[in-house]
Amino acid sequence: MGSVTAVLVIDLQVGVLEGCFDVEGVVARVGVLVSRARREGVPVVWVQHEEADMLHGSAGWQLMPELVPKPGEAMVRKTCCDAFVGTPLRGVLDGLGARRLVLAGAQSDYCIRATAHRAVGEGYSIVLASDAHTAASTAFGDVSISGEQIVAHLNRSIGGLARPDVAVELAAHDAVGF
């Protein structure tokens, strides 16, 4: 029998998504991914970021209204980019028997990337839902980087995390295999 897969929906919150690339499309595609997972009995884990300007329960902390966790789905609160640091995520995944994680959400260059790196380092195989993560445009010095470019860069580079004992995959939301 293959390893159990879990879908991690990371930080698709009102405050996190302000100014991000293709928010409406990403939220819709994550909704489809979550619906597919539920139909196939794949657990969904919801991760929400909180910090001083986005406190637990505040308007910005709320998940996008199109995305509603079902009773019994795990909710994990975090305070830094890596969803494993200072959270019960590892225990939640162990309790589910999950060894393969499908990652979707925001922001590509922060919480998605950090969680992907940690997951692989911890021995989880990962699938990045290539069209179901997003980022905001940014700049470094005189160089501007669009949210679309950040998404494309993570899609392009994620395979570099692979190791002999851990699979790293890239798949569109509607092509992720469970």
Region locations from a protein language model:
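Conserved beta/loop motifs at nucleotide-recognition and modification sites
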Residues: 43
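N-terminal nucleotide-binding beta1-loop-alpha1 segment
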Residues: 8-12
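Active-site-adjacent betaalpha module
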Residues: 2-6, 28, 32-40, 52-178
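N-terminal beta1-alpha1-beta2 module of alpha/beta enzyme domains
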Residues: 21-24, 30
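Second-shell loop/turn segments in exported
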Residues: 20, 51
